[in-house]
């Protein structure tokens, strides 16, 4: 299956000059969704790890089924105030300000190996925040897997030193 053809490009969303890769078309197509999950499973099954970290919110969509198939635990990373128990947090930069991501303080034990799974790699900024959370708790990120990588935005360069994998790569924007 050519999964790349299954994504919808929405030009100038959420603002002028952005080529937004819409994953909903993949999710709506049962065969494409299954192929996407199977592909992510194949990307990480050779790694030695115990937990999958799924960032809010699309990391939940892809991280949960991969964790299920590979019989791994799933750790959720949420925006501030969304988790009910004590948390560890990290502040990160957005285009128009700052935001905070959190993880339960007991989600990862020191020395545990994790894989981060998310929908899309753009600049890598959000992933770096997820890595900081894992490492604050003493975990080790042994792999990072994305359904989509926008290679023209240089995210992989910003994640140097980490094992970065992706199912589909877009080499240029449609804008």
Swiss-Prot record:
Catalyzes a salvage reaction resulting in the formation of AMP, that is energically less costly than de novo synthesis. One of its GO terms (molecular function) is AMP binding. GO terms for biological process: adenine salvage; AMP salvage; purine ribonucleoside salvage. Belongs to the purine/pyrimidine phosphoribosyltransferase family. Pathway: Purine metabolism; AMP biosynthesis via salvage pathway; AMP from adenine: step 1/1. Transmembrane segments: none annotated. One of its GO terms (cellular component) is cytoplasm. It holds the Pfam family Pribosyltran. It comes from Caldicellulosiruptor bescii (strain ATCC BAA-1888 / DSM 6725 / KCTC 15123 / Z-1320). The keyword Transferase applies. Keywords: Cytoplasm, Glycosyltransferase, Purine salvage, Transferase. Homodimer. Its main location: cytoplasm. It comes from the Bacteria. It catalyses: AMP + diphosphate = 5-phospho-alpha-D-ribose 1-diphosphate + adenine. Its EC number is 2.4.2.7. This is Adenine phosphoribosyltransferase. PROSITE patterns: PUR_PYR_PR_TRANSFER. It is found in: Cytoplasm.
